């Protein structure tokens, strides 16, 4: 994490101090939450829609903060060491940008409509075999989270893996202005946040903002929109590699499915690669990892070991055993592309019974009802044995799948419980706001009672 003095920070931000006699006060790390402040931290009071972090300075001091940012329009200034700034959020971002420029690590930037968190976890598992590596924790991938991730990097980090999310035009451009990625990966371009972008081509245009900030880009090439947007953006000095159905650099051969993972072949690896995660799409996510690893001279044995020992982030195709059943917790988010991929993964698991537990996909715009119905039709075509749905929009999914719609999670949970004593695979998926992970928690608690 960042280790410096308040005077150095004030100088980097071209501002002044207040409330202190000693400008050499050392800080160790930062926090934007007064409840999580650690001794030696710099407290950064963010002003949100409902809460102003300035009101929690006393709590931050009690927990050990030694200094704080302070917005100049908040007078009087406290009798406490503060760094005066015009906007605490902008100052957080500017501090992260300055700190990133002081580091000598290789930065790998990862974005994509789907798969970026899985790819990030794979990169970390592989690169940790050779280098001191740090990665984005949780979902810290936006205009607040990415600066927090950067400021949590150690001075001697060798590889920084930074996940970058996107909700609006310009988001990737802004995050790259802080991260300055050396190697960039676009895992997919789908319909997530279609409501904000209007078209898949605009989503591609937003993701490809990364192209003007990087030295090397590896992208998942699945749609003609990519070609159209690539032709708009000058990228003559960028090394460009692609993978996927229309890719030209990395090609997957045979994929063998196991109950607890997959094995696949790749044109750039001498031996088959085994992974402790499920789904053909995870083999595709591994391709840019292989590319990036070879760029940094990681040998194939280390790549193979890293991909076989991945620690996945919770709620992203996380495998959980409850009773005799295998639960696939993919409850962090859902959109049409990721839902179809998740159903493909479910159907590929070698088990006698497959159950899809689905809830609403949000932010899809005016076609939301038909898109939910398409997921139900797809589940039916795959031959999923049971499709259980909850949520207003998921009524259309259940209807098209010839499945069952429940008016509450509790009634759905009661229908699921008997299956826990059988050899079956159960997929749980929905947009984050639907909190489908509660179903898994309740099933686990019931099993332990």
Regions found by a protein language model. Name each.
Residues 1-94, 278, 349-351, 377-392, ...:
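N-terminal leader/targeting and accessory segments in enzymes
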Residues 405, 423-444:
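Peripheral docking tails and interdomain loops at the edges
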Residues 50-51, 313, 331, 335-405, ...:
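Active-site beta-alpha connecting loops in nucleotide-dependent enzymes
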Residues 13, 73-78, 185-327, 351-352, ...:
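Acidic, Mg2+-coordinating active-site environments of NTP-dependent enzymes
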Residues 9, 41, 60, 95, ...:
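Residue-level signal for inorganic ion chemistry
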Residues 110, 314-316, 433-439:
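ATP-dependent carboxylate/acyl-activation modules
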Residues 10-13, 91-217, 221, 227-237, ...:
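Phosphate-binding loop of NTP-binding sites
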């Amino acid at each position: 994490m960042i280790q410096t003095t308040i005077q150095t920070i004030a100088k980097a931000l071209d501002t002044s101090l207040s409330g202190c006699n000693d400008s050499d006060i050392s800080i160790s790390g930062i926090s934007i939450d007064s409840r999580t402040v650690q001794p030696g931290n710099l407290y950064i009071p963010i002003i949100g829609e409902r809460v102003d972090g300035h009101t929690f300075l006393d709590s931050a001091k009690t927990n050990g903060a030694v200094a704080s940012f302070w917005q100049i329009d908040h007078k009087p200034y406290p009798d406490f060491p503060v760094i005066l700034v015009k906007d605490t959020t902008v100052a957080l971002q500017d501090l992260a940008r300055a700190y990133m420029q002081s580091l000598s690590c290789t930065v790998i930037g990862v974005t994509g409509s789907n798969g970026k968190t899985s790819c990030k976890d794979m990169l970390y598992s592989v690169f940790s075999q050779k280098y001191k590596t740090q990665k984005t924790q949780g979902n810290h991938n936006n205009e607040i989270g990415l600066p927090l991730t950067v400021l949590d990097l150690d001075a001697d980090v060798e590889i920084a893996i930074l996940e970058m999310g996107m909700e609006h035009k310009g988001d990737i451009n802004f995050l790259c202005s802080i991260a300055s990625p050396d190697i960039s990966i676009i895992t997919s371009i789908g319909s997530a946040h279609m409501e904000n972008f209007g078209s898949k081509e605009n989503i591609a245009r937003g993701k490809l903002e990364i192209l003007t900030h990087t030295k090397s880009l590896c992208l998942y090439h699945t749609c003609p929109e990519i070609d159209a947007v690539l032709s708009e953006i000058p990228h003559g000095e960028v090394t460009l590699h692609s993978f996927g159905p229309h890719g030209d650099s990395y090609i997957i051969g045979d994929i063998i499915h196991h109950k607890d993972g997959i094995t696949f072949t790749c044109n750039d690896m001498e031996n088959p690669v085994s992974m402790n995660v499920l789904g053909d799409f995870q083999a595709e996510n591994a391709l840019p990892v292989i590319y990036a690893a070879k760029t940094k001279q990681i040998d194939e044995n280390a790549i193979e070991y890293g991909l076989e020992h991945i620690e996945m982030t919770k709620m992203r195709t996380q495998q959980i055993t409850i009773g005799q059943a295998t639960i696939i917790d993919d409850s962090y988010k859902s959109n049409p592309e990721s839902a179809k991929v998740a159903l493909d993964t479910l159907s590929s698991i070698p088990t006698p019974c497959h159950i899809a537990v689905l809830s609403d996909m949000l932010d899809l715009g005016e076609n939301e009802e038909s898109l939910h119905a398409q997921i139900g039709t797809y589940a039916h075509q795959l031959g999923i044995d049971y499709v259980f749905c909850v949520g207003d929009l998921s009524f259309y999914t259940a209807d098209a799948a010839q499945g069952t719609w429940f008016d509450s999670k509790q009634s759905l949970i009661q229908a699921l419980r008997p299956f826990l004593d059988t050899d079956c695979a159960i997929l749980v998926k929905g947009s984050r706001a639907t909190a489908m992970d509660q179903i898994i928690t309740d099933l686990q608690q019931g099993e332990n009672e």
